[in-house]
Regions:
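Active-site-adjacent beta-strand anchor residues
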Residues: 5, 78, 173-174, 217-218
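Aromatic-enriched alpha-helical interface/lid elements that frame and gate functional surfaces
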Residues: 203-284
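Internal, well-ordered alpha-helical segments in soluble enzyme and binding-protein domains
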Residues: 118, 149-156, 168, 172, ...
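Substrate-binding/catalytic subdomain of NAD(P)-dependent oxidoreductase enzymes
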Residues: 159-194
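N-terminal helix-loop segment corresponding to the beta1-alpha1 unit
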Residues: 1-165, 192
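Flexible, small-/acidic-enriched active-site or ligand-binding loops
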Residues: 290
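Glycine-rich beta-alpha junction loops
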Residues: 33, 105-108, 176-181, 211-213, ...
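Active-site Gly/Thr loop motif
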Residues: 192-204
Length: 290
């Protein structure tokens, strides 16, 4: 399967990287000088560009060399502002009927915000995903990756399955703002426990250890939390897991975890079902996950 990636920056690059991992051949058509990601975020570019073919073409001058490749493609991926790809001569109307053409956009097609400029942080803000965490910034670009890239991969794979049945491709559109809103749409109905997964519960937080490292503590289920309290020598805390005063319980847990270094806690919990783990460094994670 040939994927031709016309996109710029993270969402498309991440999506085509996922398709590469699934066995696709990926050819990136870049502007003269290369994808801007290479200069703005070279580490991201190196990670997401590995294994792909790259070809520099000036679509503004002549789209024909690109079209030669697009006509062979099973999938075309782009992230221009709506309408730009068509004006450049590489839009969905310029590829064969069998092609799955995916447009990653900020706000979708046809709405009032169709032409609005934006980036990951803007989309999360518009989606309501930052309302109870601002001004804290997410550690990774959630709209780009979860809503944009993975949303694109899902729609592309579904369109390819449909093509197997009908012989026809499709133009699939991803809105990073709408996709981000779906990630938090459960809040519209109200949580049974306010902010259960975003700090509202003491049994779903990050705690500092004696050596300045941190533990991810997430025993949401009572059976896991009860075992944790037994292991730390405070079994009476099990009955307080869902108390109204979560800050008091969190203070108790913080005091407990601050007494020993990270390695000690990891050794204690290693063979136990307690849903506790480290906040690993990037280097540690790379080693552990290799």
């Amino acid at each position: 399967m040939l994927v031709v990636d016309l996109s710029r920056y993270l969402p498309g690059a991440f999506a085509s990287r996922e398709l590469l991992e699934l066995g696709a051949r990926v050819a990136c058509i870049e502007p003269p000088g290369g994808d801007p990601l290479r200069s703005t975020a070279p580490a991201w570019d190196a990670a997401l560009r590995a294994g792909k073919e790259s070809l520099e073409l000036d679509l503004k001058c002549d789209p024909e060399p690109a079209l030669d490749l697009l006509r062979e493609a099973d999938v075309v991926l782009e992230s221009f502002r709506p309408g730009v790809a068509s004006r450049l001569g590489v839009g969905p109307e310029h590829v064969p009927e069998r092609t799955v053409y995916c447009s990653i956009t900020g706000f979708g097609l046809g709405g009032r915000d169709e032409q609005r400029a934006g980036h990951d942080l803007n989309y999360l803000g518009w989606a309501g995903a930052l309302w109870d965490t601002a001004p804290a910034l997410p550690p990774v670009p959630i709209a780009d990756f979860a809503a944009g890239a993975l949303g694109a991969v899902t729609k592309i794979l579904a369109a390819l399955l449909e093509r197997d049945r009908t012989g026809r491709g499709a133009h699939v559109v991803v809105s990073m703002t709408h996709g981000s809103h779906r990630l938090v749409a459960h809040r519209l109905g109200g949580d049974t426990v306010p902010r259960m997964l975003t700090g509202g519960l003491a049994s779903y937080r990050i705690y500092q250890t004696a050596d300045g490292r941190h533990l991810t503590v997430a025993p949401l289920e009572p059976v896991f939390f009860r075992r944790l309290t037994e292991l730390v020598g405070r079994p009476e805390l099990a009955e307080r897991q869902f108390d109204a005063d979560q800050e008091a319980l969190a203070a108790e847990l913080a005091s407990i975890f601050a007494k020993r270094p990270l390695a000690d806690w990891l050794e204690l919990f290693d063979s136990e079902d307690v849903c506790v783990g480290p906040v690993a460094t990037i280097a540690e994670a790379a080693t552990d996950l290799a």
